[in-house]
Amino acid sequence: AMTSDCKYGFGTELTISFDETLSRVETLLKNRGFRIFTRLDLKEIVEGERIKDIGNYVILGACNSEFAKELFSADPDIGMLMPCNIVVYEPGNGKCRVMVKDPVRIMDLINNPLAIHAAMKVKDQMEIIIEELKQDDI
């Protein structure tokens, strides 16, 4: 199910393995014109400390050049909100969780119709990716 407990993002939990989920997310992003520019591993960020209940945890930073052109044209400061972050992690319940930052929620603060319009297109693509992931999870 689409997880609704997060106020600034959306996503799903899958039963497939972490590695399989990560590779599937990367493929689906690429299929929708998103390039992955950053890949952060939580282990590196927290210098090997264990965070209670969390297993593998990777943050992917992705951008779609078409949407990025629209966003930067609408507001050059938008770079602070880039890239689009997608997290893939093991929450400790035997599943794999995929969450996407909700670009529209964040753009609402900007109050620029062009930026909001571009953000809605990004969100549509991300929602499709989450749906595609759920369909794979038999």
Please give the residue ranges for each predicted region:
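Beta-strand/loop substructures that line and gate deep hydrophobic ligand-binding cavities in soluble
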Residues: 85-111
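A generic structural signal for well-ordered coil/turn residues at beta-strand boundaries
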Residues: 4-8, 56, 82, 94
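Well-ordered alpha/beta subsegment
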Residues: 109-138
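Short glycine-/small-residue-rich flexible loop motifs, especially phosphate/cofactor-binding loops
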Residues: 26, 43, 127
